Amino acid sequence: MDEQALLGLNPNADSDFRQRALAYFEQLKISPDAWQVCAEALAQRTYSDDHVKFFCFQVLEHQVKYKYSELTTVQQQLIRETLISWLQAQMLNPQPEKTFIRNKAAQVFALLFVTEYLTKWPKFFFDILSVVDLNPRGVDLYLRILMAIDSELVDRDVVHTSEEARRNTLIKDTMREQCIPNLVESWYQILQNYQFTNSEVTCQCLEVVGAYVSWIDLSLIANDRFINMLLGHMSIEVLREEACDCLFEVVNKGMDPVDKMKLVESLCQVLQSAGFFSIDQEEDVDFLARFSKLVNGMGQSLIVSWSKLIKNGDIKNAQEALQAIETKVALMLQLLIHEDDDISSNIIGFCYDYLHILKQLTVLSDQQKANVEAIMLAVMKKLTYDEEYNFENEGEDEAMFVEYRKQLKLLLDRLAQVSPELLLASVRRVFSSTLQNWQTTRFMEVEVAIRLLYMLAEALPVSHGAHFSGDVSKASALQDMMRTLVTSGVSSYQHTSVTLEFFETVVRYEKFFTVEPQHIPCVLMAFLDHRGLRHSSAKVRSRTAYLFSRFVKSLNKQMNPFIEDILNRIQDLLELSPPENGHQSLLSSDDQLFIYETAGVLIVNSEYPAERKQALMRNLLTPLMEKFKILLEKLMLAQDEERQASLADCLNHAVGFASRTSKAFSNKQTVKQCGCSEVYLDCLQTFLPALSCPLQKDILRSGVRTFLHRMIICLEEEVLPFIPSASEHMLKDCEAKDLQEFIPLINQITAKFKIQVSPFLQQMFMPLLHAIFEVLLRPAEENDQSAALEKQMLRRSYFAFLQTVTGSGMSEVIANQGAENVERVLVTVIQGAVEYPDPIAQKTCFIILSKLVELWGGKDGPVGFADFVYKHIVPACFLAPLKQTFDLADAQTVLALSECAVTLKTIHLKRGPECVQYLQQEYLPSLQVAPEIIQEFCQALQQPDAKVFKNYLKVFFQRAKP
């Protein structure tokens, strides 16, 4: 072997050596017999370096995985012998190999097993067992090989081809017949021999049993001999976690409901008499987390049995199953309420399913009602934050608690389905007693009390948030709690979690303020002062900005008396903060978007006359326009690139803020009706010069483009005079991405204004196409994926543009471009349909083609178009689906084929018998299609039902492809 190259395998080797080692690995993979050197090195134990041994196994692995069928029988025998002699050597080694080498060896054994077991090596396991016997080194490797085989055969995370899946099923069937009983016996012997002397091997063996039990005959494991041993392991500290997991897999195995019930009950009796149900005596939380998972598995198994028995009408056994479930509830509750969240989380599935049973029962017993209440109290307690939760810097632990809370919320929702009255009463009790003394109560208890009120909104659902009408007792309970929330002063609590929960809840129950509007002023003040938008925590300020906009939007009819006051109070929050002023704004620019939107909503939805609305909107937007002009001048003069970028950002924010105010308008309150057209036209005139700024083009163009999109909706035809010059600037110095983002703007204008913009479209059609073609024809690096993707997206945008033009009744825009240009455009559409393996673009191209055939394909169409149909469009309908890249198993491709069928149908519709004749006598014979198939094709094409032809076409191409 190349000793110099092998030096590069050491993790501390320099990059040159590492490169050489990689190159050597590639060389050995390609060479037909170099792997034999590695096999010999392993069998002879030539190298002591761990990384070289690992390398040799990697080379063998590649050989078995990808080249095995190319090897001669002798070479295949050599690989088998190499592995067995390596295994024999492990029995005698003074030191065991490193874990990573043992794992890699096990993988190679497993690969060889799945390749050879059914054909050349049926005695695989017997050969291995005869080598390892009960030698601890050998047993360790045997168990690792079994786990590697399990992951090859059963692991759902590994994606298998259908051929591999069939092979794996056959292997498992054969193993069940030929060797599983022997393997199970070997596991029993290993467990018995090593349970007190080698915990590592015993735990490995328990893991193997747990993995295999899912697909072998359960009676081999679920018998007195085996189960008693597993239960014995539950009392040995170093084994009990693994034993717990193994029992969980046994319990989880699908089986007859009555047998499952008996198995679970017998397990429970032994565990209970051994003292495992006394949770409070146990201090090892890691074990309890596994035990909780086991109890969850047993509980859910009993519930599955109950469901099956009910479904089968076996009432007697169903009753027994329910009884068995009920006797586990006390244990479930102990685990649910445990202070360790992992232990609690592991039992939630059982708890949830138990509540689902209760929901189905017509009458609950007193004990069941007590259970529901106990679960409810447990959920309320467990929802509470602990002292360690870090609100300022949330890490992994905090994220896990947030996930755990989501699980508890599902339990709460399920509780509401079982007993809504009880839930409401329990929450009300906790809420009222906590809010009464909030000043002296710990933050986590105040937060959870408000949180519970918040959660009721989803737990007790109503349509359109109408919590305060309908059911009187429920409405009045919620109303009482909301009144307490807004009048208790709890919004002043000095903890971010309480503050945020207050605002979240106020917004969740905004309908309360239509019933009791007298509370609106105090809540508005909370939003606007140090409790909300001016809070010391940026997180609270940010969330409040969003919630404030929701609050104002949903209560816009109630806002009239407060509009001017609110606008005055948020004045400083609306300031565009230029990069050079140095002071940190209270709100980020994203948060300011919500404040601008809120201001827009207040003005537009006010009861003021149009002149007042216009004045207020001008007051809102004029400072932005003035700042914009100053900043644009500064940008033109800025030398430093970092400063240019921050100025461009600021300009972009200004445009974004103005855009956002326009979201307040609607069909009922248009810009015109509110008298605000002039203000937005002024904005347009202020912002458009940014398009001719040579610096920071991307960000400036993006902002102005978005603003234009909004103005097309809001100002309608008043925006049209600005479009030509804006388009001209945006088409200068274009990249693929610029064009791709510019085209939707033109599509929007075309679709909205149609004939009104025909002159503009005619004028800019070819300049736009030239810009697109120029970018598409630019050479790119062969393996530059991002450039290829950008071109693909631009191509799609180009076809989408043509689709919009043809679909908006504007085909004359294309027709008027001169014969040469028209042909060039049509050829690009044909190429799009046939050449590029992009089904989304292909679908669009066929839509364009069928539209053009519909418009121009008749007797009075443009000169030469009928020829084009037969020379190019008809062939495209066959050449595209016949390509290897046209995958009929892909959903997008099927949609493209569907449009291809529409195109052919449209040609037939416009050209009649002439089209059928052309297909019958010229085109299809040229493709060597058999006469009877041609006949069949033409008959399907002439069917009046388009769907018939679509279905036929798919079958036609499935048959035609090799």
Swiss-Prot record:
Assigned GO CC terms: cytoplasm; cytosol; nuclear matrix; nuclear pore; nucleoplasm
Region (Necessary for interaction with Ran, nuclear localization and nuclear import) location: 1-385
Free-text function comment from the UniProt entry: Mediates the nuclear export of aminoacylated tRNAs. In the nucleus binds to tRNA and to the GTPase Ran in its active GTP-bound form. Docking of this trimeric complex to the nuclear pore complex (NPC) is mediated through binding to nucleoporins. Upon transit of a nuclear export complex into the cytoplasm, disassembling of the complex and hydrolysis of Ran-GTP to Ran-GDP (induced by RANBP1 and RANGAP1, respectively) cause release of the tRNA from the export receptor. XPOT then return to the nuclear compartment and mediate another round of transport.
Record-linked PANTHER family: EXPORTIN-T (PTHR15952:SF11), EXPORTIN-T/LOS1 (PTHR15952)
InterPro entries per the UniProt record, alphabetical: ARM-like, ARM-type_fold, Exportin-1/Importin-b-like, Exportin-T_C, Importin-beta_N, XPOT
MF terms in GO: small GTPase binding; tRNA binding
Gene Ontology biological process: intracellular protein transport; tRNA export from nucleus; tRNA re-export from nucleus
Swiss-Prot/TrEMBL keywords: Acetylation, Cytoplasm, Nucleus, RNA-binding, Transport, tRNA-binding
Coiled-coil regions, chain positions: none
SMART domains, sorted: IBN_N
Keyword DNA repair in record: no
Keyword Cell division: no
Pfam families to which the protein is assigned, alphabetical: Exportin-T, IBN_N, Xpo1
Name of the protein described by the UniProt record: Exportin-T
Annotated positions of the N6-acetyllysine modification: 634
Subunit and interaction comment: Found in a complex with XPOT, Ran and tRNA. Probably found in a complex with nucleoporins. Interacts with Ran and tRNA in a GTP-dependent manner.
Localization: Nucleus; Cytoplasm
Annotated gene: XPOT
